[in-house]
């Protein structure tokens, strides 16, 4: 019997994700990113970008394509993606997603390592130190460090412009959050509850629940996270609804076998409530990028729809094309029926 392959898409792991306003697609950041990963023992060895035709190739033999993925975009492309893998223990993935036109409010950087690495020894502390080094590198507005299964089960789509999504095992809050919450309250949090509160060099803060990150979904840790939310103030949290398990397959949904009202319930949940949000740093840099994009000619609606795999239909209607079958669907009417985006609480 052959050896079972590693499930790169669904492996159990611990994830670090940063939401970054400040553009960080420079050669210096790309080089330092690899240096930090290597320093902590997580050097990747495989690469996939549009410049490798989305194929997985050996990183060291394709460094030009690595930097090109960070620095260049295809004509009319609205984003840049760099995907990395580490195929030896601890195995994991590293992804960079950058809005090339500056219209999306955040860029993303994430690192995921397999769960076994965190079960014993210094792995957890080493990963946390790497996270702090990456925080210093990209100056994010927000970051979370969590067991991946727990993070998926606890929240839906995270929208920082509607408030914090919740408290996770590790929480990086940029200086804008420190200013909004008040450092006195954050210091008191570390005294009153069994959590670690660390002031970061840029006056941001790191809140860690303690214990092992793999236990973050236990009742005790969930209660501790809830206590932190209560202490800081519920008005700062958006309380995004966790995703509901789908009682149907997407194949049946695309085939029109699922009633529109059921699709709306599970695929178009109500918006989360609006919480208090800070004034995010570096917004002027994103605005500058957007202006540069527009001066360069930007992209038409038709080109954007083509870029993401959609097509124009009629006077403004949009259809989605199933790449596997070639069948097209009118959205939202044909699949979801008429309906709004949901009501705020």
Predicted regions and their residues:
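C-terminal interaction module
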Residues: 1-45, 153-345
């Amino acid at each position: 019997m052959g050896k079972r392959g590693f499930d790169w898409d669904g492996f159990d792991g611990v994830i670090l994700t940063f939401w970054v306003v400040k553009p960080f697609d420079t050669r210096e950041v790309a080089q330092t990113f690899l240096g930090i990963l290597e320093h902590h023992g997580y050097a990747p060895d495989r690469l996939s970008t549009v410049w490798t035709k989305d194929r997985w190739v050996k990183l060291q033999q394709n460094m030009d394509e690595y930097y090109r993925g960070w620095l260049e975009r295809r004509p009319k492309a609205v984003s840049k993606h760099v995907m990395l893998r580490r195929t030896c223990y601890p195995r994991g993935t590293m992804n960079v997603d950058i809005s090339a036109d500056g219209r999306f409010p955040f860029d993303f950087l994430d690192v995921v390592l397999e769960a076994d690495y965190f079960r014993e020894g210094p792995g957890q502390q080493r990963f946390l130190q790497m996270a702090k080094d990456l925080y210093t590198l990209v100056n994010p507005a927000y970051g979370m460090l969590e067991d991946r299964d727990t993070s998926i089960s606890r929240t839906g789509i995270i929208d920082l412009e509607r408030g914090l999504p919740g408290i996770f095992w590790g929480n990086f809050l940029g200086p804008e959050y420190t200013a909004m919450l008040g450092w006195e309250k954050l210091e008191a949090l570390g005294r009153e509850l069994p959590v670690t509160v660390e002031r970061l060099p840029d006056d941001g803060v790191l809140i860690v629940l303690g214990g092992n990150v793999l236990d973050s979904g236990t009742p005790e840790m969930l209660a501790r996270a809830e206590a932190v939310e209560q202490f800081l103030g519920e008005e700062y949290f958006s309380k995004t609804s966790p995703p509901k398990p789908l009682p149907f397959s997407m194949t049946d949904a695309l085939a029109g076998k699922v009633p529109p009202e059921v699709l709306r319930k599970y695929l178009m949940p109500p918006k989360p409530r609006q919480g208090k949000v800070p004034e995010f740093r570096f917004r002027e840099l994103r605005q500058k990028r957007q202006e540069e994009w527009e001066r360069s000619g930007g992209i038409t609606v038709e080109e954007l729809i083509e870029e993401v795999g959609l097509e124009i239909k009629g006077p403004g209607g949009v259809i989605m094309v199933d790449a596997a079958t070639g069948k097209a669907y009118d959205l939202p009417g044909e699949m979801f029926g008429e309906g709004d985006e949901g009501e705020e609480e």
